[in-house]
């Protein structure tokens, strides 16, 4: 069973539907016992980092997620991926879950072309930087769907794939041990995204 963490942030049903379309058992939950019983965990998320972290804290699931990430595959998606890092500088400084070394910063900090929209939204190709079982059904350069204006940086050792936006190589996919993350939305990325979710289900 794949547990989808419900903490009031994220498009849970779209993700659940994508997993079920693959014939996978998925459960939306905020019960610690269900996260412990799961074979894999997905941490979704949309919105602002600080607000999401507070909501996650309110569920009491932070220590459970940190503990289970040592024993089973965990996938953070979009803001869920950003929460995996040490800290974020989105509207202040906020602590992350500390599962992947690195930080989350505003794209504007690093974009040299100030005419580009700060919101990186739409389809972009993902360049595979490091081979990984997560990409066993994924081809280098396939297009995936992004919606974000903050991105993970100072995390070179964990990067699996990047997408170019202006002069910035946006961190698109990461891994640190059992902990994976995608800045893009696999559940919104068509067949390529479904194949990536299938690969995650087999890790």
Where are these regions (language model features)?
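N-terminal beta1-alpha1 ligand-phosphate binding loop
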Residues: 2-24, 186-188
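Short gly/ser/thr-rich secondary-structure transition/capping motifs
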Residues: 21-28, 56-59, 125-129, 163-165
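Short acidic low-complexity segments
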Residues: 26-37
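Structural alpha-helical scaffold elements that stabilize or flank donor/cofactor-binding regions
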Residues: 34-35, 68, 173
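Short acidic/histidine-rich motifs immediately flanking catalytic phosphotransfer sites
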Residues: 36-45
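Cysteine-nucleophile active-site neighborhood
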Residues: 49-120
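Amide-donor transfer/coupling interface in amidating biosynthetic enzymes
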Residues: 102-203
């Amino acid at each position: 069973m794949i547990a989808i963490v419900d903490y009031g942030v994220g498009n849970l049903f779209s993700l659940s539907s994508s997993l079920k379309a693959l014939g996978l058992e998925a459960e939306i939950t905020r019960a610690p016992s269900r996260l412990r019983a799961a074979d894999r965990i997905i941490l979704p998320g949309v919105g602002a980092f600080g607000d999401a972290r507070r909501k996650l804290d309110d569920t009491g699931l932070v220590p459970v997620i940190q503990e289970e990430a040592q024993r089973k595959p965990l996938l953070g998606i979009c803001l869920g991926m950003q929460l995996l890092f040490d800290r974020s500088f989105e509207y202040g400084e906020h602590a992350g879950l500390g599962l992947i070394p690195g930080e989350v910063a505003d794209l504007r900090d690093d974009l040299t072309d100030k005419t580009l929209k700060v919101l990186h939204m739409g389809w972009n190709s993902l360049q595979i930087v490091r081979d990984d079982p997560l990409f066993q059904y994924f081809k280098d350069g396939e297009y995936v769907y992004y919606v974000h204006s903050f991105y993970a940086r100072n995390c070179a050792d964990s990067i699996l794939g990047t997408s170019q936006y202006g002069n910035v190589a946006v961190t698109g996919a990461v891994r640190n041990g059992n902990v994976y993350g995608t800045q893009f939305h696999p559940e919104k990325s068509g067949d390529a995204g479904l194949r990536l979710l299938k690969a995650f289900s087999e890790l």
